[in-house]
Amino acid sequence: MKNLFLTLLIITSVSFLNAQNKPQRKVQLALLIDASNSMDGLIEQAKSRLWAIVNEASSLTVNGVAPILEIAVYDFGNSGISDKNYVRLQTNFTSDLDVVSEKLFALRTNGGEEYCGAVIEKSLQELVWSRDPNDLLLIYIAGNEPFNQGPVNYKSICTIAKSRGVFINTIYCGEYQQGVKESWKDGATCSNGAYFNINSDAKIASTPTPYDDQIIQLNKSLNTTYLWFGEQGVMKKNNQIIEDKNAFNLGSGIASERALVKSKSAYNNASWDVVDAFQADSTKILELKDDQLPEELQGKGPEEKAEIINAQKEERAKIQAEIQDLSKQRAVFLSKVNRNPANAGVKDDFGTAVNKSMKEKAVLKGFN
């Protein structure tokens, strides 16, 4: 009996260690946004739905562990872009979600030629895609001109994407059948991706709830737990506030969605925030000189710094838990609103298209 117990203990320990040693899964989203003259509505939808998309991605798990989320942004079809095919990288894959928001809010439209094959080709060439077959790799391209325009054959690019395990998902801004005629459906199915059509001029309704004011106030308290460090720290801290305001200006509901993101592990700012960086590598932070640190940590010894940082960490965790609790109540409220017959038949928009297909493809990769 004793030997059996020891054997079971060893098997359990090995299984635990194997689970611990498995690398954290990744979800990589490349957003390719048509920025030609008629696409102002599309850009507004992308800005409005960013935090809903991030919340959906961060809810995916494998063995109870959330994935690392990385998002890249391109705009194309804008005549102000110097590239011969009117394609521009706004940000490579990044986990800095404030940067993603910043880039989306900076997008502007201008007349130009929309070459879908060219922007997909660029995204496959320039972005650092994961080579792990277990990771979820997704391209979302949205626009309203024929998919086969331009010098790059989308079919050949689609073959490359499929061979790398990248799903190309297409979002046509217009009538469903028109998108089919203009090859947007074929542009998706050729890589086993999903095809959607949306009304890009439809405004995203930010449904207010009784919980939004509390969540927004907690978000302000959450911001006080962030302590900058390094050359870009102050700028990054200021940008956090700017992106809060950008979300709030779109509606209290969207501000609440952003606050929920900030309560999760997906919102990690180890590149500029002392608390996140300390958790990743405490030695690095404790070795920084005073001119690289905020006033709260200047002139302090290692033990005192660690004490202050840990106190901030505990306060942050407490606020995040409160935001998550209120967000659950908010979700219940919204589910009741959405069950109302008056809200039946709501059509897809940029965000729902992304979230539907992301969930579908995630299941194929073993995510829950």
Language-model segment annotations:
Residues 8, 68, 85, 218-221, ...:
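Alpha-helical protein-protein interaction elements
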Residues 21-202, 209-212, 283-286, 290, ...:
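Divalent cation-coordinating acidic motifs and surrounding scaffolds
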Residues 1-24:
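Bacterial Sec-dependent N-terminal signal peptides
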Residues 185-285:
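A post-motif C-terminal structural segment
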